[in-house]
Amino acid sequence: MSHACGANQALRLHHGTLNAVLLPTVLDFNRDYIGEKYRRLNAAMGQETDADPAEFFRDLNLKIGMPQNLGEMGITRGMISSLATHAAKDSCTSTNPRHCSTEEFKELFETAIGV
């Protein structure tokens, strides 16, 4: 998803910032597919093992002044279809623990854009 957003050269978006902003949305999407890894992640971060890692990263992003959603970075709803198509074709998508269809990418981008 970060690659899809970063491909828009006019916006000049930083890849690491995109990763940070998208991380909570992707963690929510994958939650039911990698529960044990989430418990290990929480333990490594000093959190309760049943804590919500997506919420942890939302809070962290807020504390360090990161954008809270893609909308704050200039991504609009009108871009969703092309972003989803790009993300679905990205070879990095194959490493995600949960398969994501183009339609699911559209939903994820909708969520990540925010209000």
Briefly describe each language-model feature range.
Residues 6-79, 115:
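Gly/Pro-rich interdomain helix-loop hinge
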Residues 1:
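Oxyanion-binding "anion nests"
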